[in-house]
């Protein structure tokens, strides 16, 4: 197995860090998977050769030497045998047909299972086309109704949603489940016989299995968040209750592809496997691919002889059996099962959402195999399809729950890391750099590890389990020598990464993550070997007993796993690498070529930059928001921290009849909300004032004045926490949608006792879209509003399955998750639960995407028995839909512009690199002092250009949080670069440049962001040059320095720059762009506005002043002095 090592050439902050580590991790995972394909193919070859020669297969030894390469054609042959094995299990029969003609192109040799009678044997009396053979029309083998069902399934867009199809043989009337799926050459029909007394023979029985699954899903959804272990324990209990298997396990795949049993329920006399770890080769990559295609796989009897599949000679390769449940297992898997005393098994895939970067799209590519739910039994038996489907349904629900749990876990981990980083930064200010190792929390608390160390200035500070000081120094020297061009290395095996001293570290230190913080200093995190955390969960052996390592068995798998991971640690997660990178960036910026006291001064300065409030900008935004709220067509109201109304727009005043003036200052809960809504609104208020914003909450408001005749105004609102400029919550704003008319009709409809058809079929626009389900989840009602919303008529959908045929077929849904969620909601409602405001979206007949809120209520007959459900759609108003569509179009345009910008950035970089290379060649020649200055000016202009192209996070700049570089620079070099950028325009217009810059200013050494101040001054100068009248015009640059003493021998220089020119000055709209955040009238105005924001990040400011005959930019900014001696020359 290849080492999980990563190098980092350079890092950027935030999302760039995460993207970099994710891409690296994705590449590593793919490489690991490809290496495992090689191992799997070789193991299969060894197993098959041992069988042919009569020798026993030494499983443990084969795994340990599995890393020898095999030819590519051998891997291809291996995959073909797994996916196109040409054998099935004898519990069912398989037919493959051409999809359009239904002509048989392949069939299994156990066709006698179909009881075809006289047709099964060719004879003179019967025409040849009636015999089950290649070319037979499969429809002739079944009853007319069965043939019609198969034809109906064949034209379905998503054929799997039509399963199972009940079919009967034409002669014997023997019933079968027909499970159909498409392959490259046609359609495969898996036929499984229905046994007498099978509880699932009727539609009611199939629905009952769904109800059992829904009950199990409800249990999962009721579990407390944040406990994946409890979730897995509950799943194995539910699956055992559904299937009755002797043993049910949850088997989780780790990042390095090995597996672990994380939950188990079993018969008391069976040996436990809980906690057992398996090597990655125990479940080959080819098998994992099969699980993604066919998520439930069953072995009825591992001892049964497989049945051969006969196929047409026209087919170019063996029939693909990936999607067929009867597909026979390979001999090695059957032998493994037999060795562990299991006869039949049921394996179900647990699929979760994969990484966006990894997936790169939708569909299966964006999904990831998280693990398996594995069932074993000691006697043979087939599980009927409806029960398998119910289990698959449960697995889909488990995948959804796991997605939420894993997201929550990632958020909690990230919060912990951010909190630790904040504390580490605080320590850095008080005691740099030793505070991050001598105080608590320390760097060891940043990520999960066994030890950590700081190597700084040739000295070591060590925490926990680490190498010795001499070994750490040796590792640092090795990194500098062999990985000198990278800023960090992370690996789960120092031995595999090539560190020559790995053997001397023993098992205590196997994995390492390092981050270089200066040219020769490092942070280290260490992990011990994985095997120390692994414990065998089985029965203890007598000392005299010995395991047979050659047999394929869980114990030999575990032994082989321990050999594989003996010198390997747990891999480093993406979020851990991101945390290390972030801390590395902070320290690299802080410790770059400066002493400790300089470090602290600079860090304080940098933090001050990031604490800008931008109160004037927030005020302008607030004014604009007030105007939008007052004129909005949606009802909007707001309350202060005490629940008193301080916002009441015209729309809510119109609906309630209460004028704005009277509403202000009233208590929302006590004066304006109906009693039945009080508890809901109080809870929403309480949560919002704590920062927890709720959505789609129903609020009933009282009516006044002209609206008094209405009982109430019913709003569905979203709560938004209102914050002041210091980010403290000061109130709550509610943005709502008026649903009064729909709610009144819906309530009457639900409560009605007699004939409801007059309401369902009413064309009244106030009637919401309504459809109904019978107890089998088939559509029994579809009103005119539903026809309008979906484009499908009543007659086209009545009697069809709501899941699959209507939603999923007629009205397409976005992905399998949407199908699963809708199925759960529908069955929960048919089980008696009421569903409120479930977000639901689909594509109508014309392909338009429709978003709605679904409310579902149970239907009962006179005896109170549940007979189905009523479902209501709440569709957003046309105005809101239009606004959303406009937003989507704007997002498309923005994305197109981003692509253009990315193209331009890339194409500019190439010639820029050429210029940089040419300059470096010039630097190596013999240059005069003036020529050296020209080359230096060119270099700083190149750096400015590079920085502008790299700084794409304008949103952070808008919010006042862009990160600034802090380094020593010479002010004279900056001024030369600024002037050089204006020289071409200056000469073209024949303008005179006047520079009034004191000599001490040119040589002044400062700390700050050299490139940013250069960009700001150059932008102001270029705009002045554009609007200076010519000829005989002039432009003057003046600099006035003032020294400030901070104490402790530290000095700050206040710099005043004046860029002056004669004439009328810059156009008024351009000056307005400089100071107006909301919009820009000109392209130049965008640059001016951004430069002003950059200046404010530096605690500076700019004004544009018009005086008689002249105008000028007045720029004020402060920088720390780099050397105290300079202070003596400044007054």
From Swiss-Prot:
Residues 227-406 form the GAF domain. SMART domains: GAF (SM00065), HATPase_c (SM00387), HisKA (SM00388), PAS (SM00091). PROSITE patterns: HIS_KIN, PAS, PHYTOCHROME_1, PHYTOCHROME_2. Residues 903-1123 form the Histidine kinase domain. It comes from the Eukaryota. Phytochromobilin binds at residue 332. Regulatory photoreceptor which exists in two forms that are reversibly interconvertible by light: the Pr form that absorbs maximally in the red region of the spectrum and the Pfr form that absorbs maximally in the far-red region. Photoconversion of Pr to Pfr induces an array of morphogenic responses, whereas reconversion of Pfr to Pr cancels the induction of those responses. Pfr controls the expression of a number of nuclear genes including those encoding the small subunit of ribulose-bisphosphate carboxylase, chlorophyll A/B binding protein, protochlorophyllide reductase, rRNA, etc. This is Phytochrome. The lineage of its organism: Eukaryota, Viridiplantae, Streptophyta, Embryophyta, Tracheophyta.
């Amino acid at each position: 197995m290849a080492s999980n090592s990563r190098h980092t050439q350079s890092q950027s902050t935030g999302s760039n860090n995460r993207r970099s580590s994710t891409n690296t991790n994705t590449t590593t995972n793919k490489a690991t998977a490809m290496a495992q394909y090689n191992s799997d193919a070789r193991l299969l070859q060894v197993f098959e050769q041992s069988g042919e020669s009569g020798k026993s297969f030494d499983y443990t030894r084969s795994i340990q030497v599995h890393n020898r390469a095999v030819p590519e054609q051998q891997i291809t042959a291996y995959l073909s045998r797994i996916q196109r094995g040409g054998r099935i299990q004898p519990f069912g029969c398989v037919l493959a047909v051409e999809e359009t003609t239904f002509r048989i192109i392949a069939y299994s040799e156990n066709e006698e299972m179909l009881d075809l009678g006289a047709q099964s044997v060719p004879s003179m009396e019967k025409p040849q086309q009636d015999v089950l053979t290649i070319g037979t029309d499969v429809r002739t083998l079944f009853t007319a109704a069965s043939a019609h069902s198969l034809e109906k399934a064949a034209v379905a867009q998503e054929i799997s949603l039509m399963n199972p199809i009940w079919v009967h043989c034409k002669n014997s009337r023997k019933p079968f489940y027909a499970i159909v799926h498409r392959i490259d050459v046609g359609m495969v029909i898996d036929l499984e016989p229905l046994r007498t007394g099978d509880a699932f023979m009727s539609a009611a029985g199939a629905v009952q299995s769904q109800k059992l699954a829904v009950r199990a899903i409800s249990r999962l959804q009721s579990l407390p968040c944040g406990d994946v272990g409890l979730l897995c324990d509950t799943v194995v209990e539910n699956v055992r209750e559904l299937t009755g298997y002797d043993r049910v396990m949850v088997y989780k795949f780790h990042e390095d592809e090995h597996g672990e049993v994380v939950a188990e329920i079993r018969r008391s006399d069976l040996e436990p496997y809980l906690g057992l770890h398996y090597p990655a080769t125990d479940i080959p990559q080819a098998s994992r691919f099969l699980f993604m295609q066919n998520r439930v796989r069953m072995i009825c009897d591992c001892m049964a002889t497989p049945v051969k599949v006969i196929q047409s000679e026209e087919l170019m390769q063996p029939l693909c059996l990936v999607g067929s449940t009867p597909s026979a297992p390979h001999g090695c898997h059957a032998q493994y099962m037999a060795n562990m005393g299991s006869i039949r098994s049921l394996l179900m895939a647990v699929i979760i959402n994969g990484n966006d970067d990894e997936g790169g799209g939708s569909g299966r590519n964006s999904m990831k195999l998280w693990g398996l739910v594995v069932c074993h039994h000691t006697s043979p038996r087939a599980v009927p399809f409806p029960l398998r489907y119910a289990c698959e349904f449960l697995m889909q629900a488990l995948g959804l729950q796991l997605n939420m749990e894993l997201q929550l876990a990632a958020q909690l981990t990230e919060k912990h890391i951010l909190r630790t980083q904040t504390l580490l930064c605080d320590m850095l200010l008080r005691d740099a750099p030793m505070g991050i190792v001598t105080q608590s929390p320390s760097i060891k608390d940043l990520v999960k590890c066994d030890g950590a160390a700081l190597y700084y200035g040739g000295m070591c500070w060590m925490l926990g389990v680490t190498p010795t000081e001499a070994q750490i120094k040796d590792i640092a020297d090795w990194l500098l020598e062999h990985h000198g061009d990278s800023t960090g290395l992370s690996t789960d095996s120092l031995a595999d990464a090539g560190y020559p001293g790995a053997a001397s570290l023993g098992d205590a230190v196997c994995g390492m993550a390092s981050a270089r913080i200066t040219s020769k200093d490092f942070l280290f995190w260490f992990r011990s070997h994985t095997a120390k955390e692994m414990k065998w969960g089985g029965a203890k052996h007598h000392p005299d007993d010995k395991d047979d390592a050659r047999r394929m068995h869980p114990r030999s798998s575990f032994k082989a796993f321990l050999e594989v991971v003996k010198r390997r640690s747990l891999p480093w997660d993406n979020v851990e690498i991101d945390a290390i990178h972030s801390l590395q960036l902070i320290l690299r910026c802080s410790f770059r070529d400066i002493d400790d006291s300089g470090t602290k001064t600079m860090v304080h300065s940098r933090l001050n930059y990031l604490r800008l409030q931008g109160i004037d900008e927030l005020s302008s935004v607030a004014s604009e928001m007030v105007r939008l709220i007052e004129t909005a067509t949606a009802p909007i109201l707001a309350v202060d921290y005490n629940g008193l109304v301080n916002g009441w727009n015209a729309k809510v005043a119109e609906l309630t009849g209460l004028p704005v003036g009277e509403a202000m200052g009233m208590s929302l809960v006590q004066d304006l909300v109906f009693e039945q809504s009080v508890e809901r609104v109080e809870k929403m208020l309480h949560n919002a004032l704590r920062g927890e914003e709720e959505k789609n909450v129903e609020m009933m408001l009282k009516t006044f004045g002209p609206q008094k005749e209405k009982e109430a105004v019913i709003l569905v609102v979203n709560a938004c926490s209102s914050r002041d400029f210091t980010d403290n919550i000061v109130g709550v704003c509610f943005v709502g949608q008026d649903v009064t008319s729909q709610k009144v009709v819906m309530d009457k409809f639900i409560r009605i006792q007699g004939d409801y058809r007059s309401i369902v079929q009413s064309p009244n626009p106030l009637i919401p879209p309504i459809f109904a389900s019978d107890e089998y989840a088939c559509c029994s009602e579809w009103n005119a509003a539903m026809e309008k919303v979906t484009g499908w008529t009543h007659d086209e959908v009545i009697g069809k399955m709501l899941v699959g045929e209507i939603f999923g077929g007629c009205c397409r849904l976005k992905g399998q998750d949407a199908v699963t969620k809708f199925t759960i909601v529908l069955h929960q409602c048919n089980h008696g639960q009421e569903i409120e405001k479930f977000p639901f979206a689909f594509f109508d007949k014309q392909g338009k995407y429709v978003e709605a809120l679904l409310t579902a209520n149970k239907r009962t007959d006179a005896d109170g028995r549940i007979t189905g459900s009523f479902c209501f759609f709440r569709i957003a108003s046309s105005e809101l839909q239009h606004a959303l569509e406009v937003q989507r179009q704007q997002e498309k345009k923005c994305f197109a512009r981003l692509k253009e910008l990315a193209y331009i950035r890339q194409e500019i970089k190439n010639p820029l690199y050429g210029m940089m290379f040419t300059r470096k060649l010039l630097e190596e020649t013999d240059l005069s002092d003036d020529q050296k200055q020209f080359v230096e000016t060119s270099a700083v202009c190149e750096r400015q250009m590079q920085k502008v192209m790299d700084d794409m996070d304008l949103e952070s700049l808008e919010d006042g949080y862009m990160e600034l570089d802090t380094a020593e620079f010479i002010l004279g070099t900056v001024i030369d670069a600024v002037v050089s950028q204006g020289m071409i325009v200056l000469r073209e217009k024949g303008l005179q440049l006047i520079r009034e810059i004191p000599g001490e200013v040119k040589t002044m050494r400062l700390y700050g962001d050299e490139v940013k101040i250069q960009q700001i001054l150059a932008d102001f100068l270029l705009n002045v040059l554009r609007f200076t009248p010519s000829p005989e015009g002039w432009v003057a640059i003046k600099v006035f320095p003032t020294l400030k003493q901070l104490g402790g021998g530290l000095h700050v220089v206040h710099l005043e720059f004046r860029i002056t020119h004669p004439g009328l000055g810059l156009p008024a709209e351009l000056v307005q762009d400089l100071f107006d955040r909301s919009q820009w009238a000109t392209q130049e105005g965008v640059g001016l506005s951004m430069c002003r924001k950059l200046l404010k990040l530096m605690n500076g400011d700019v004004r544009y002043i018009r005086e008689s005959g002249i105008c000028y930019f007045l720029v004020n900014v402060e920088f720390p002095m780099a050397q105290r001696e300079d202070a003596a020359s400044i007054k």
